[in-house]
């Protein structure tokens, strides 16, 4: 069997063989450290019972390590130029399928139904293209897919925001959106030096364990997220001002918003970043009652 893909020498050989040039627009940074890849697979808890969805396999460095341990790996690759490379580099593995499609446009549930019938669990494990990290993760969460969890490499700053706690400078609407659906934990930091080409930012691996039920029960999830988004619209403004200025018809309903805050025992002079997800749940339900 071939030597591991994820070494500097082998990666260079593969890229030279195919005359591959990186597309900045696709956020292509390939990992060249097998130890880090192994640790990612460890954090994902992949076993011979696991089906894995990978997004952006590149030349197959992570795919290869997943294929060694998983029952089945299905990878979404948007860049047509990588398809013949993947066919070559992953030829030793008969448990890998590559789908040439943008995962944001894919029917992921249908792919799961088709690919993973004989798997006990499904994980998403990926080194995500940084420019579409958040849309990809939110799509996977909002579609309520039967996933056990998501373990992905992403920009450290984004990982910090996803796992942030109230009253920290990283805490915001993304923290709440991710933690509504999952338990989020940053499991490792990754230096720039283990990629080609080197990215401009530091990276981290985050583990998102899917909750059986959302973190909080709310009457209307869409309205809950609307309230959260409004509360963080301008971080320096008070919660009351943000709600008035950013909720639909907020300015005409100042007194109702004030009443909802009082009923929820939340001081309108606080800032959105100081509220826990539980407080946002109470507030959004009360706002819904008085506004809708």
UniProtKB/Swiss-Prot annotation:
Gene Ontology CC entries for this record: cytosol
Binding site residues for S-adenosyl-L-methionine: 29, 31, 56, 77, 102, 127
Keyword rRNA processing: yes
Enzyme class per UniProt: transferase
Subcellular location: Cytoplasm
Chief location bin: cytoplasm
PROSITE patterns assigned to the protein according to its UniProt record, in alphabetical order: RRNA_A_DIMETH (PS01131), SAM_RNA_A_N6_MT (PS51689)
GO molecular function, one term: RNA binding
Gene3D superfamilies: Ribosomal RNA adenine dimethylase-like, domain 2, Vaccinia Virus protein VP39
Keyword Ribosomal protein: no
EC number: 2.1.1.182
Main function: Specifically dimethylates two adjacent adenosines (A1518 and A1519) in the loop of a conserved hairpin near the 3'-end of 16S rRNA in the 30S particle. May play a critical role in biogenesis of 30S subunits.
HAMAP family in alphabetical order: 16SrRNA_methyltr_A
Protein name stated in the entry: Ribosomal RNA small subunit methyltransferase A
InterPro entries: KsgA/Erm, rRNA_Ade_diMease-like_C, rRNA_Ade_Mease_Trfase_CS, rRNA_Ade_methylase_Trfase_N, rRNA_adenine_dimethylase, SAM-dependent_MTases_sf
UniProtKB keywords: Cytoplasm, Methyltransferase, RNA-binding, rRNA processing, S-adenosyl-L-methionine, Transferase
Catalytic activity, reaction form: adenosine(1518)/adenosine(1519) in 16S rRNA + 4 S-adenosyl-L-methionine = N(6)-dimethyladenosine(1518)/N(6)-dimethyladenosine(1519) in 16S rRNA + 4 S-adenosyl-L-homocysteine + 4 H(+)
Entry's family note: Belongs to the class I-like SAM-binding methyltransferase superfamily. rRNA adenine N(6)-methyltransferase family. RsmA subfamily.
